[in-house]
Amino acid sequence: MTDDPFLEMEATQFTKTGQAACGDDVQLLTIEKENRSLAALSDGLGSGVKALVLANMTTTMALRFMQSNLDLLESVEIIMDSLPVCEVRKISYATFSLFDYHLGGRARIIEMGNPAYVHLRGTEEVAPAKDRTVVSAHWPDREVREVEVDVEPGDRIILCSDGVTQSGLGSGQAAYKFGWRRSGMLAFARRMISSEPDLSAADLARRIACFAKNITPESCKDDISCLVIYFRHPRVLRILTGPPYYKSSPARRTWARITSSSAAARRRTSWSASWAAA
């Protein structure tokens, strides 16, 4: 078995109450020939279909630029210049979190406007190996953070929209006066992993998103998106297949037809060979 980690990348999303579409977008891409995995999570301005259009444009362009290894600042400027301008706020805007990993190397995370990523090794948070912030001359009010992290089997990286960290804000609950916040999400993820060390990416993403949603169970105040990337050891799957146990099974009858056809084909082949020899 290879020592290289296997990546699980899974996301859970909830739509803001009253909206027909989630204003966040998540896209995942695996490039097998490059042993490379990419992910993009974007939160479009506002909510509903318009926000989804902004978010989808952002994730689509971001994945293409990462695939092409385009310069970070140039990529961000193209994305921001391409987004339509909101008629009310007079700004073009979509936040994003991007993930880029080559098998055997460091993982790269790029963020603008979204809550800061979480990197857990077991239940311990891991600091980045490199961390820098860049500012575009075109958009001086936007800061883009780029980090590189060393990863090991068992590590998890969590990306989310502010619908997760701000959940509970304005609900009147004392515990969520300032929302759930990143610290609350981090503590929750640690508890989940502590109780189930092999918890899958899909289950952890679902639990985080569901908890954020259920802080105000009567309504979802914002679009909620949580993406979890889990680096784990590959698992070996062995499958033994054969005819069904019960004769009454439709699959058994199918198996019988297949074996009967195979036997008939062998007889025809044998007869043809005998005729040719004669």
Spans of model-derived segments:
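Primarily the active-site beta-strand->alpha-helix module of PP2C/PPM metal-dependent phosphatases
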Residues: 25-80, 158, 170-186
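Catalytic core of PPM/PP2C metal-dependent serine/threonine phosphatase domains
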Residues: 52-123, 144, 199-229
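Acidic loop->beta-strand submotif enriched in PP2C/PPM serine/threonine phosphatases
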Residues: 19-34, 128-170
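Conserved beta-strand-loop-short alpha-helix elements that form
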Residues: 35-47, 111, 150-173, 229, ...
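Active-site beta-strand/loop microenvironment that shapes enzyme catalytic pockets
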Residues: 250-275
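C-terminal catalytic subdomain
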Residues: 166-251, 277-278
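Regulatory cytosolic signal-relay segments
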Residues: 1-22
